[in-house]
Amino acid sequence: MRKKHFLFASVLALLCGSSTLYAQDFKLTSSGYFKNQGVDVMAFDDIYPEGHQGGVCIIMNGHRVATNGDIRLEATPGQWQPVPKQLDRKLGDNSITATLCYPDSSRHLTGFNPMIYPDLHLIYTVNVESKGKNIEVTVDLDRPIPQEFIGKVGFTLEFFPGSLFGKPWIMDGQSGIFPQQPNSPLMTTQPNYLHTGNYHDGKQSLADMDKLIGKGYSPIVADDIISEPYAKGRKFTSRPDDPYNKVTIESLSGDLQLFDGRMNHNNGWFVLRSNIKPGVTKGAVKWIITPNVVADWMYQPVIQTSQIGYHPAQDKEAVIEMDIPDNRKETAQIIRIDAHAEKVVNNVTPANWGK
């Protein structure tokens, strides 16, 4: 989610660049996200948590590593589980503070993707702040978590599984690999639908809860049988073997747990989670996130052509997207590829275009 430069050239080329220098600490940009060279951290900039998009999001060297850092009501939520409603988002000097709440009554048992919201009323703030090379996440609640939801309400961060299969992780002194196939033992928990809230006046047409729940496995419920955590501890490192994807998370407020969300959802991700303790409000969650920063990393130029084609009389122009600090002014080549060989048919000097 970085601002980009563009070059513009006839038929196949354009470049763009800037002499912008990066600080060695995370800084809040004018676009509303944190940046430290090739690492970007977003916070509540987009809202689609059921699609693994929203909350605190970590992008490292062009790849989205983790996302959906937020309060959730299940250890491994899927696309049918309750999501919070975002009330506000404010930018500070070097911080982002979002205010959210449960329930979102407009989604309770209604709509194309009905969700079952429990009888839990909660307003909370998530403050995300740059602390040098670290990102500090602090969650404050407006009230303690009710006893019946202790162990269910927690802060989660989801890791994209596709790039982690067979790769290592470390939790305190324990190490392991992210498995390609979920293999954790199972455990049972009390499902939240046993404490369903009443958020409608009886005039709306609501989904049939009995049909949603069913008699066997139901992804609408999905919190009665879940995976046991692969590990518990206070400090977790994903991909310690790879400087381009290594990220360390330390919890100052309670244990971290690593879950496999694919056990009860076919589109689940790996989930790092901290449960919220009984009786706490201020500082209910405090995480220190430390992504590894590779000095002077830049992404490779990306050639963009028209997605709808070109008119026969139109100049065929393309855009070469460059990373912000990439100020190279190289010649672009147009290459014809056939069954026999490749041949350079033209050399183009790109023109600056865009930011």
Regions inferred by a protein language model and the residue ranges of each:
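Extended acidic/polar, glycine-enriched regions
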Residues: 271, 276-284, 291, 324-326, ...
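Beta-strand-rich recognition/accessory modules
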Residues: 212, 216-297
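Bacterial N-terminal signal peptides that target proteins for export
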Residues: 1-9
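Contiguous beta-strand segments within globular domains
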Residues: 300-328
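Acidic (Asp/Glu-rich), glycine- and aromatic
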Residues: 136-185
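Extended, loop-rich substrate-binding clefts of extracytoplasmic carbohydrate-active enzymes
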Residues: 73-144
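Beta-strand-rich N-terminal accessory domains
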Residues: 23-95, 112, 190-219, 223-226
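Bacterial N-terminal signal peptides
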Residues: 9-18
